[in-house]
Each structure stands twice: as C-alpha cells, then as structure tokens.
Amino acid sequence: MAKTTPNTTRSRSAVLKSPIDATPESGVQRTVLPGGLRVVTEFIPGVRSASVGVWVGVGSRDEQPSVAGAAHFLEHLLFKSTPSRTALDIAQVMDGVGGELNAFTSKEHTCFYAHVIDDDLPMAVDLVADVVLRGRCRTADVDVERQVVLEEIAMRDDDPEDLLGDAFLTALFGDHPVGRPIIGSVESIESMSRNQLHSFHVRRYTPQRMVLAVAGNVDHKQVVTLARRAFAGHLERGVKPAPRREGTLRLRTMPELSLTHRDSEQVHLALGVRAFGRHEGHRWALSVLNAAVGGGLSSRLFQEIREKRGLAYSVYSGVDTFADTGAFSVYAGCQPENLGEVATVIREVLANVATDGITDAEIARAKGSLRGGLVLALEDSGSRMNRIGRSELNYGNHRSVAQTLTTIDAVTSEEVLEVAQVLLTRPFAAAVVGPYKRVRDLPASVRGIVGK
C-alpha cells in the first residue's frame, strides 16, 4: 500500500565502442556506457512524444535512521538549481515547450523524468541529466525545501489513506528501512543538514546506479549520443553497472497492530502479511490471486463487503513488491459501527481462499483484468518509459508484452492455491486510522487480527 511521492514542481566523453544489445522480442535496445550507465530505449510507432527518465537505484530503504527521508528530500532539492540553471530557468524551459518535468521516490529507487514532443528530446535529456548530476545542495535552498517537505508530511497526515499506508508497512516490517515512510518524519526532516544531503547525493548518485530510459518516437543511437554528451565527465572507464538489488530480508520482530487516532467520520483499516520478493518466482500467481480477491468490482471482497452487505464504500487488496520481500494487504474504509463486521468478513474471505483457492471463473476474470490493464497502460510513451526503466533496474532484462501475457495465461489454479496457502496463513499486521484512542477500544475482531 505504499505510494511513491512525486515532486510538486512540475564537449564529449572518451568514446568507448559499446555494442547495442538489441532485444527484438521486447523491442527494447540497450547500451552500457563507461561508468556503468545503462541506456535503454523503446521506439513506439505512430507517436510524436518522447519520455525521458533517469532512474537511480537508490530509495528510502538505503537511508540510515538519522537521515530518514533523505532520498525524497534530495529529489525535491535537486530541482532548485544547477551551476547553469536556476529553478526558474528549469521551469521556464519546460513550460516553453509544453512539456512535463517531475520526479518520484520509492523504497528502492528514484526517478527524474520529462515528457516532451520528439523534437525536444535533446533538451529533455540534457535538462534531466543536469538536475540529477549537478543539482546543488545550497543551504538556503535546503531551508526553503525543508518547509515544503514538512508541508507534504502535514498533507499526508490529513489524508487517512496515505497515513494508513505508511502505518501499515511500519506495523508489518517494524523499524526495518522497508517499514519506514518514504517521506521521513518531522523529526528527521527538521534535523537534516545540508552536508548530510550533499553527502547522500555524491555517494549514491553515480552513473553505475543509473539507467537512462527513453521511449517514444526516438532513435537508440541518437539517445546514446545525447547520453554521452549529457553525462560527459561522469563516464569513467572500467566501471560496470551496479548489480541488481537482491538479498534476503531478516526480521526479528513480528507484525503488529498500529492505531492512529483521528476524529473522523470513517475508520480506515489495512491488514495483511509479508509476501514474496521480486526474485522468488511467484509474481504472476500472486497477481492473479490479488485481482480475484480484491482487484475489481467482481472481486470477492467487493462483492461480500459492499455489494452483499453494504458495509463499506471502498474495499480492495494490493501488492507491494521489493527485492527481498513484499506485502499483500487489504484496505477498507467504513463507519466505526461497521468495523468489527468488516474485519470479520475480510478474515473469512481470506481464510476461505487459503483453504479452497479461487474458482476457474475467478481465475479467468483475474487474468483478463491483468491482460487488459497491462496493455491499456502501455499506450503512451510515459508508461513505456516506466516499464523499461523499472525492468532494467529491477531485473536487468526486458520481456515483451506478448511474453508477459503468455506468462499470465500460464498461471494455474494450483499455483494460485499454493500462493494463497503460503501467504494467508502467515502472521498478520493491521493498522487503523480513526476515532479510537486506545487499542482496547477497537472491536475484538480487529484486535484478533494480530492476537491482541
């Protein structure tokens, strides 16, 4: 249930002959430049747009507790100025071509991106690279942007679903970096210094951790040339790309129950379990399970809780996936007097799925939903850029849409049942945001989720 946090601001290096790694099955072309910078492109016929993203394999889980929120703070700060551009210059050049410039931070990576017409591709590559590589951490800018981030935290605190998402992951993962909010805390942001942010930038933002992803009406060789120019002075010979993020998550703490008091008309509930890391091989079986359980209007949770009983307006399930772990969660927002029954029905639905799996008809609908969602989401260059940038950072390879659709179709009911039996019998965490001051004031069915 974690959400990425967008920024609110919308000479030539030594030549190394880098072979183009063309992958005709996926339509993605890939070149590795000196310094370990990876350049991946996808040509989309029939469009006049180009989307450019510089992906950095650094996110909030890479922070020490004393600088919690640094990756997101830095994402904001780098737009303030570079040696050759002021914040106004950056805004005006993008406004002048009708483009979009933005960024977001997640647990494991940060992306700075631009969306422009194809004629403005050279400007977009140069601008995004300038911000990422040469954005300055000036003390005055740090103090100004600190207030912006604190306002963003206040805005998060006023949005029950956003607040709940952060509280749930903390309840599930404890004080592990995956469990900490991407945005940080008031305490960490207020105490963070210019030197800490500058050090984070210099140490973490290196080409070997970066991917330049470009999609649209683009030519791969031209993009490589633009990359050499934009990253000149940073492409050091003999440096290879950083390996993909892997590892095994080890936690000593058990999932917990979190309660945040808010004088609200509704109560917001999230409950769920630790799930699989992205390299464990259960991605699509879990996706099918998620779609069937809480992914749409015909899902079990929606039908049982809203359509049959009218207990909640919004109810859905979701999956968060990280390199070495993940989360499967269910959200519901309801009147306080309905919370106990909502929690009971959710647990009954999940228990039935863990015992009996889902029907063939549910699997067919879930697969159709995944197929349609995947294809429809890739009809613009921004979505394509996101897909190839994430794939390069997370997996180091690229699959075509057709290959992915074939993989989805191959998921069996036995695989879905196995995933359900493994996940839904694990210890649950829960988070509640609403008009309750003490855990003991919560309905017994909610406290029972984590054995309270």
Residue spans of the language-model regions?
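Charge-rich, well-structured scaffold segments of protease-associated domains
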Residues: 2-15, 26, 32, 43, ...
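Active/ligand-binding-proximal structured segments within catalytic/core domains
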Residues: 36, 43-94, 205, 281-293, ...
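Short loop/turn motifs at secondary-structure junctions and domain boundaries
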Residues: 20-23
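A short, compositionally biased domain-edge/stem linker segment
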Residues: 16-18, 39
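Flexible, small-/acidic-enriched active-site or ligand-binding loops
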Residues: 255-256
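A domain-level signal for the structural core that forms small-molecule/cofactor-binding pockets
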Residues: 271
